[in-house]
């Protein structure tokens, strides 16, 4: 399967391009995943979907590459879907080895010096160059050549804007063709190999319920849970918000819940041990009038599923529980199943500025309603 590295110096608009590409590919129903690798990010479009002030507080920074680089190298190499990989603007020689797991490259550079540097970097790791693009903040969008590689200019790549123009559209079409050529029958194969008899494709589920697959709304949750059998082994496949996965995981309890992880394939939501939290998964407790809030933090940014049995979480007795943090879907799913005893559960969803109730046993707090996060 292709893994396309996006390369260029800092402040060249690479993150804007990455987000624009994944949105355009999603609009064309092209299966893929965007992975940011500096340090890695669990949700590729996280920083563009949330409010800027929220982003400032949630951006992952401090992990050393020694902690996450081997895991990321392993997972890119074992990918289960085509990838877009944003490798950052200043990779170290050690971090540059991620390119060995990639197959193609896209250059976005503002000047000849950075272009030469990144072109040599891609050549060292044997990447086939798909596009050689110039970033010009105040210039004009243009397609200079449609051969191999594509050549052109992308203008105005500022946060809050989307890439556009003939060079961008040509790149989207080229990526779509590359990814689709690698994908025939892959979706069906993934669903057929699900470990649960009932495997649900998130995109198909959205359309069945009249939802936009690229813009799920929390108010759809009651219909989702009405549609799916309760207390039954379930497997969920595809791109969806954390609250959707958390709600279905809680709905399946006590039966098994599985989800498809682009890095690992099908994984089961693990059981987490009770106990005093460790450095691997930090937990801060806030107590409010209506709920307790657990603020989770991953100091190393990239968490291996194999470590789940060593991630103790604190017992909580409260009528309502809000789970906050930036976590992989498998961990959200595990947490809501572990805290089933609470009268209602909500998971943070910064894109809506609050937390979405994913399980409730009381009428006053129905599933799908958004509640405010507790503030320190």
What are these regions (language model features)?
Residues 4-23:
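Glycine-rich phosphate-binding P-loop
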Residues 27-45:
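Short beta-strand-centered segment that lines the nucleotide-binding/catalytic pocket of NTP-utilizing
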Residues 168-322, 326, 330-376:
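Long, low-complexity, Lys/Arg-enriched
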Residues 46-63:
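Conserved NTP-binding/hydrolysis module of P-loop NTPases
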Residues 1-4, 232:
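Pre-Walker A (Motif I) flank of P-loop NTPase domains
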Residues 89-167:
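Conserved catalytic-core segment of NTP-binding enzymes
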Residues 7-10, 37-39, 87-89, 108-111, ...:
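Structural motif
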């Amino acid at each position: 399967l292709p893994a396309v590295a996006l390369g260029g110096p800092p402040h060249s608009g690479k993150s804007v391009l990455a987000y624009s590409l994944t949105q355009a590919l999603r609009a064309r129903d092209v299966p893929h995943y965007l992975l940011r690798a500096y340090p890695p990010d669990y949700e590729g479009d996280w920083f563009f979907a949330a409010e800027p002030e929220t982003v400032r507080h949630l951006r992952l920074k401090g992990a050393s590459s020694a902690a996450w680089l081997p895991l990321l190298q392993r997972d890119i190499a074992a990918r289960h879907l085509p990838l877009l990989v944003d490798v950052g603007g200043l990779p170290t020689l050690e971090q540059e080895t991620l390119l060995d797991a990639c197959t193609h490259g896209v250059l976005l550079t503002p000047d000849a010096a950075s272009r030469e540097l990144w072109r040599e970097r891609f050549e060292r790791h044997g990447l086939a160059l798909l596009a050689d693009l110039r970033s010009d903040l105040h210039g004009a969008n243009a397609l200079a050549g449609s051969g191999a590689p594509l050549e052109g200019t992308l203008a105005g790549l500022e946060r809050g804007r989307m890439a556009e123009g003939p060079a961008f559209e040509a790149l989207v079409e080229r990526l779509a063709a590359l990814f689709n050529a690698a994908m025939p029958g892959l979706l069906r194969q993934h669903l057929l190999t699900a470990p649960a008899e009932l495997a649900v494709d998130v995109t198909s589920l959205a359309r069945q319920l009249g939802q936009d697959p690229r813009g799920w709304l929390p108010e759809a949750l009651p219909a989702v849970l009405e549609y799916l059998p309760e207390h039954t082994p379930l497997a969920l496949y595809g791109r969806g918000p954390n609250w959707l996965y958390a709600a279905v995981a809680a709905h399946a309890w006590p039966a098994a819940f599985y989800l498809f992880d682009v890095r690992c394939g099908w994984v089961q939501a693990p059981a987490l041990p009770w106990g005093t939290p460790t450095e691997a998964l930090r937990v801060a407790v806030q107590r409010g009038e209506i709920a307790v809030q657990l603020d989770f933090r991953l100091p190393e940014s990239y968490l291996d599923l194999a470590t789940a049995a060593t991630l103790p979480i604190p017992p909580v007795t409260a009528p309502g529980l809000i789970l906050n943090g930036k976590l992989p879907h498998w961990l959200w799913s595990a947490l809501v199943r572990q805290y089933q005893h609470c009268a209602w559960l909500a998971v943070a969803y910064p894109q809506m500025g609050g937390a979405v109730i994913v399980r409730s046993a009381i009428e006053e707090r129905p599933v799908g309603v958004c509640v405010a996060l507790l503030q320190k």
